[in-house]
């Protein structure tokens, strides 16, 4: 089974990643990946980013061939350390 460190490393290697991508890449069930991502987020190691698809070409997710779920993309990336000044 993959560890939190392996999940964090996979995000680092990809730059950013969706939960489903990490699930496939690491062969971990999606519910477990989601729980691990929540834990890493709570620990301050990664950040959750909801992508804004308001610039969709069709202007309406209802008629989008990708479906409504495609419009609600959430990615994870490493949290940038605060620079000391």
Curated annotation (Swiss-Prot):
May function as a transcriptional regulator that controls feoABC expression. The keyword Oxidoreductase does not apply. The gene is feoC. Belongs to the FeoC family. The keyword Oxidoreductase does not apply. Gene3D superfamilies: Winged helix-like DNA-binding domain superfamily/Winged helix DNA-binding domain (1.10.10.10). This is Probable [Fe-S]-dependent transcriptional repressor. One of its GO terms (molecular function) is iron ion binding. Keywords: DNA-binding, Iron, Iron-sulfur, Metal-binding, Repressor, Transcription, Transcription regulation. It comes from the Bacteria. It comes from Yersinia pestis. Iron-sulfur cluster binds at residues 56, 61, 64, 71. InterPro entries: FeoC, Tscrpt_reg_HTH_FeoC, WH-like_DNA-bd_sf, WH_DNA-bd_sf.
